[in-house]
Amino acid sequence: MDHNTDPPPTTMVDAAAALLLEPKLEGYDDDGGGEPLQPAPFVSPLDQLMQPPRPLEALLQGPQLPPFLSKTYDLVCEPELDGVISWGHAGNSFVVWDPSAFARDVLPHHFKHNNFSSFVRQLNTYGFRKVHADRWEFAHEDFLRHSKHLLKKIVRRRSSPTQQSGLQPGSSGESGLDPELNTLRREKSALLQEVTRLKQEHLQTIEQMSTLNQRLESAEDRQKQMVSFLAKLLQNPTFLRQLKMHRQQKEIDSTRVKRKFLKHVPHGNIDSGESSSQHTGESNLDFSPTSLDLPATHSDILDLQNFLLEDGDLNLAMLPENIGLDGIEAPDDIGALVQGFDTQEELELGSGVELLEIPPASGPRGQDPTIGRSKGKNVLSPGLDATSSEADCLGSFSDNMGMLSDSMLQTAGKLMDADDDERIWGVDASSALQSSCSGTSQQAYGSLVSDPYLMEMANKPEKFWELDFQALDDGDLQLDKCVIDDPALQQQRGNMNS
């Protein structure tokens, strides 16, 4: 007889009940030997209870999935929510297309909050990363389409004990960073203050540069005006001679006492003009009216050069490399004016010294009725009649004189005073100006040294360039009258001299 045993019970209670109710059976062999079969070994219920339990099917799947991952996976796979959240094109990421609708309609039904930022932070704790800068697209290497079983590999990140201790308030790590942060803050504040100071200095430097540029432009304008005026004087020597004659007839009382340097001249030379001429071997200057009718010659330009060269104060300022002017046109003789600068240092005179004047050149000495002896500035022959030609002659000159400052006029007067002093007191400048002056001019200048009338004029302080247009009335001031090219005036002077 075959003996079939039942399958093992599934539970301990069923196993214990089966053991108690199952009858004890004895079997015999099939061959009829009558020998009974060996009974089955007895297993007590306690032994069955001691057997290890068998796990259920759910336990075979490993650890359970976190609810957050399973819910998120279900939301991404749900077709109804494709307009709000769905898989990416490659299936290895998901995209939240409408964060506001996702937070308003989806999160409250599946999570305990409706904050989209909290949802993103929780994704970061599980290792998700944002893969697109312009949209909310997240990806994880184990979060794939049709691969839900890979979710068990996604583990929540846990902070290490060292990090937790470092994040605890009042920890030693935070206390060690505080001094460094304070030091950095102080350094930053100092750097900001330094930058502010440098900005202020930069602005001040810009203002100073602007002021210097304006001063340089003003100085260049004055130099251009001066050189233009001197060039025009070189081009009009006839007017220069008239200016010299007028200066010789004028007397201006000085309010201060000035020293006068007189060269000792023997009485014999003072009394006799002929002996002085023989001693110097030079002829006297001709200031007759006929000489005014002659055209401008090279010697006339040299006379002006002598006037301009005899003041040492302007020697350095008038050098070509110091002036730096390219637009001024002047005659070729102005080059000779520059050559004599270095040799004129011995002729420099103090600004507080008043020099003697050249006496009148035409008619009786100091008795010319046609030339007044008025005080003021720019008084040109106030006793003469005005003509249209005279007004034309002085038109351009008055315009140029208006452009010059008072200091420039005084400088021009010093130049002319220094020239007369050389010729009166016999200062030998012929060696310095030998390359630019002709022999006739040198002889003419030398003859003035022994002129007895010059010694007589020593006690008459004169200063040429103190001209005052506003000091005279309309009857005395005839600025627009010129005596250079008037034939009637020249004839009148010839009659007076004859």
UniProtKB/Swiss-Prot annotation:
Gene3D superfamilies: Winged helix-like DNA-binding domain superfamily/Winged helix DNA-binding domain (1.10.10.10). Keywords: Coiled coil, Cytoplasm, DNA-binding, Nucleus, Phosphoprotein, Stress response, Transcription, Transcription regulation. One of its GO terms (biological process) is cellular response to heat. InterPro entries: HSF_DNA-bd (IPR000232), WH-like_DNA-bd_sf (IPR036388), WH_DNA-bd_sf (IPR036390). It holds the Pfam family HSF_DNA-bind. A motif (Nuclear localization signal) lies at residues 258-263. Residues 156-180, 263-291, 356-382 are annotated as: Disordered. PROSITE patterns: HSF_DOMAIN. Residues 180-235 form a coiled coil. Residues 184-234 are annotated as: Hydrophobic repeat HR-A/B. Residues 160-174, 272-291 have a biased composition (Polar residues). It is found in: Cytoplasm; Nucleus. A motif (Nuclear export signal) lies at residues 309-316. The keyword Phosphoprotein applies. Homotrimer. This is Heat stress transcription factor A-3. It comes from Oryza sativa subsp. japonica. The gene is HSFA3.
